[in-house]
């Protein structure tokens, strides 16, 4: 299946869905945030998958959102890792949670992003955490779920 190569900034803004086909769209830095842009996974060098393209169609749709993980090595892309790091920091800094609750929530954060067999557990833990943490932490975790959560998480949380 012929896919294009996408160009995305380190903060997850999509610059081009098909930078390999339209090199004139390439930008070394993001015009929205100023971050460096990439076209390949920093861990393994695989191209970032853009959109499916058929030569006879001639139409290149834009990416809905930046992919969370590399298809070749499974590593989180920089924007995903950054979001996970921020969510971890929010959880660690909130005194309302016990050490065990912090550890459990942090361990299930990847299951908020990707739908896995553990996603339902992640939703239950997230709901529990949202009910006891400060409003600042709750707002940050809700925003994390809105921007990076899989559809099941968004649906279960009513986002």
Regions found by a protein language model. Name each.
Residues 2-138, 156-159:
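Short amphipathic alpha-helical segments that predominantly mediate membrane engagement
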Residues 146-159:
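C-terminal, charged low-complexity interaction regions
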Residues 136-147:
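Transmembrane alpha-helical segments and their cytosolic interface motifs
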């Amino acid at each position: 299946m012929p896919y294009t190569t996408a160009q995305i900034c380190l903060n997850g803004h999509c610059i081009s869905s098909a930078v390999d086909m339209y090199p004139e769209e390439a930008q070394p830095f993001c015009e929205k945030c100023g971050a460096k842009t990439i076209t390949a996974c920093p861990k393994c060098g695989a191209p970032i998958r853009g959109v499916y393209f058929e030569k006879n169609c001639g139409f290149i749709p834009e990416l809905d959102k930046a992919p969370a993980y590399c298809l070749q090595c499974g590593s989180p892309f920089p924007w995903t890792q950054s979001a996970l790091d921020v969510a971890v920091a929010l959880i660690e800094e909130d005194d309302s949670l016990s050490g065990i609750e912090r550890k459990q929530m942090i361990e299930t954060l990847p299951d908020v992003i990707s739908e896995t067999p553990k996603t339902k557990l992640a939703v239950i833990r997230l709901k529990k955490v949202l009910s006891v943490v400060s409003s600042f932490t709750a707002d940050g975790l809700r925003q994390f779920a809105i921007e990076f959560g899989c559809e099941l998480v968004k649906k279960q949380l009513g986002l």
